[in-house]
Amino acid sequence: LANYNTNLKVNPPLRSKADRDALRNAVKLGHVDCIASHHLPHESDSKIVEFEHAQYGMIGLETAYAVTNTAVENLTPLRTVELFSINPRKIFGLETPTIDINQKICFTLFDPTIEWTPQKQDLKSRSANSPFLGKKLQGKAIGTLHPNAISLFV
């Protein structure tokens, strides 16, 4: 926060490097059950003010996979799906979807090999309060399959 980037003003606040390293290690060791984006978009007016007056929050949905994949080395695709989809469903008592004939599906397609640098014009959100704009990330969500629509982002 040395440069007072209001896109980094979040609650709970960002922690020390040691805390972030411990969190990465906890994910690697399987001590973290799930990851959520806590997507909290804001209009630019609420973020282009003095740090103390800026709203808490950042967008996270569009970069959640890439940021996690970048931050946690050697995260397998299966572990990623567990953290973002399977385990949250278990925690909240939701049915886990199955793949079967005539079964409606809802999937996110991701490619862990894509290296990219998010830019404001890449975002689908109406908000752009992301601290990851201009930062190199590894892995990208490339599309969604839904009963009513197929969307590809590449």
Q: Where are these predicted regions, by residue range?
A:
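Short C-terminal domain-edge/linker segments immediately following a structured domain
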Residues: 16-25, 64-70, 137-144
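Histidine/acidic residue-rich metal-binding segments in metalloenzymes
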Residues: 1-35
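A short acidic, glycine-rich active-site loop
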Residues: 8-18, 55-60, 130-137
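His/Asp/Glu-enriched, well-ordered alpha-helical/loop segment
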Residues: 25-29, 34-35, 40-112
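A generic local structural motif
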Residues: 19-23, 95-96, 130
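N-terminal start-of-chain detector that recognizes signal peptides
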Residues: 5-8, 79-82, 114-119, 123
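Short acidic, glycine/serine/threonine-rich loops at helix termini
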Residues: 1-3, 45-49, 120-122
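C-terminal cap of metal-dependent C-N hydrolases
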Residues: 50-53, 104-154
